[in-house]
A protein has these predicted regions:
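N-terminal signal peptide c-region/cleavage motif recognized by signal peptidases
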Residues: 13-17
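Generic marker of residues within folded, mature protein domains
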Residues: 10, 79-81, 106
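Sec-dependent signal peptide recognition
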Residues: 2-8
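Long, C-terminal folded domains that constitute the functional core of proteins
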Residues: 90-92, 136
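A short, surface-exposed beta-strand/turn
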Residues: 96-134
Length: 136
């Protein structure tokens, strides 16, 4: 009897542990996109993620006719490093639980992205010398 109870407890612990491993990791919330972009610039792996809150999230949900409880995920990744503190970043805004009708007639998760060049000081990196020469 004790053996069966011990096996049952062990099975419950293993099931609980397996569920914990498959659950999605918790993301922080932010209304500060600039801070998230700077976090990606500073990050060793060049990425940053958070749930977007505040007026920008509300506007995006209103424009896409998403339900009010829909969450907006912001993911920032590095596409290119120009020099220390200056990167080409891709910021993706997505609503994983909100499906929208596409022009092809399929229902797809809402997702859009922006690519931008940014330095830690807030200025764009100089990636080309075109137009910087003296006028003739």
């Amino acid at each position: 009897m004790k053996h069966a109870m011990l096996l049952s407890m062990l099975a419950m612990m293993l099931a609980a542990n397996a569920g914990a491993q498959t659950s999605p990791r918790q993301l922080p919330e932010t209304a500060n996109i600039r801070g998230l972009l700077l976090s990606a610039i500073d990050s060793k792996n060049g990425t940053a993620e958070a749930w977007l809150t505040g007026p920008m999230a509300v506007k995006l949900k209103n424009e896409t006719k998403a339900p009010p409880n829909t969450r907006v995920k912001v993911s920032v990744s590095t596409l290119q490093v120009f020099r220390p503190g200056c990167k080409r970043l891709r910021m993706t805004l997505a609503m994983p639980m909100h499906k929208m009708l596409t022009v092809k007639g399929t229902m797809e998760m809402f997702q859009m992205y922006y690519d931008l060049n940014l330095c830690r000081d807030g200025q764009p990196p100089q990636v080309s010398t075109v137009g910087l020469g003296a006028a003739r």
